[in-house]
Amino acid sequence: MKFDVIQHLRKKAEKYINRAMRAAESGNDLEAAKLFMRAGGTLITLGRGLEIEINGDKTEIH
């Protein structure tokens, strides 16, 4: 996985987290939860991409 792709996914997750924190501060818990889920999904995508690169596509997700 190229470094620029890693940086892109990290920044994308960071933006979701920052937006979620602002939503939570303003009392919009539902929107905050949605944004935290998106951030989590982005981080899972990043982790899975790195895992595939290291171990190949034969690894199991635990």
What do these predicted regions represent?
Residues 11-62:
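Short, charge-rich amphipathic interface segments used for partner binding and complex assembly
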Residues 1-10:
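Short, charge/polar-rich alpha-helical segments
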